[in-house]
């Protein structure tokens, strides 16, 4: 159970440091959380890379992507302010296959401006208010992002990129990966 901004940030830092138990954990919010003044670190962010090859996009999943269950229990996370020049931007960085995220509203501002964007060649950045990337096989239901998102590369109000599991030949969605979710900005 998570009830404070400190507990939420601690969870993100454990996942991003490679703690597999944390990455596969089962989390539930017990109250609304205000992130005002918190130096946020997207959940499951480091190592996500996007490769552009002949105008066809493939997602490459990081080992630190969120792979567990996150139940917002109808609560809100407010005050998110995240800006980066070097990595994926969103409340979640990468929601990996088999992960489930549900019943959560996030409010805030997400900005991704890689300083070397034009020099990246085949690499790019992803930015989305709720998640930078959602990988096929993940389930995100009844989640909402209220705020603003700005960036280069693959950018979306709710999610920046819906990408394929690298083990699959093509992107096939057997059932909706993102269901009953909204963006207001």
Where do the protein language model's features map onto the residues?
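Surface-exposed repetitive/solenoidal architectures
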Residues: 1-185
């Amino acid at each position: 159970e998570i009830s404070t901004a400190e507990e939420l940030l601690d969870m993100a830092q454990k996942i991003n440091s490679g703690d597999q138990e944390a990455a596969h954990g089962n989390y539930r919010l017990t109250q609304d959380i205000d992130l005002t003044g918190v130096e946020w670190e997207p959940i499951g962010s480091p190592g996500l890379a996007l490769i552009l090859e002949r105008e066809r996009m493939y997602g490459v999943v990081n080992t630190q992507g969120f792979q567990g269950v996150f139940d917002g229990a109808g609560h809100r996370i407010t005050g998110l302010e995240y800006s980066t020049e070097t990595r994926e931007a969103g409340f979640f960085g990468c929601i990996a296959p088999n992960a489930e995220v549900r019943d959560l509203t996030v409010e805030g501002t997400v900005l991704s401006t890689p300083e070397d964007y034009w020099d990246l060649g085949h690499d790019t950045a992803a930015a989305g208010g709720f998640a930078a990337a959602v990988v096929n096989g993940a389930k995100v239901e009844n989640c909402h992002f209220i705020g603003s998102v700005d960036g280069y590369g693959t950018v979306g109000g709710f999610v920046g990129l819906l990408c394929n599991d690298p083990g699959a030949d093509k992107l096939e969605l057997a059932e909706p990966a993102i269901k009953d979710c909204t963006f207001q900005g």
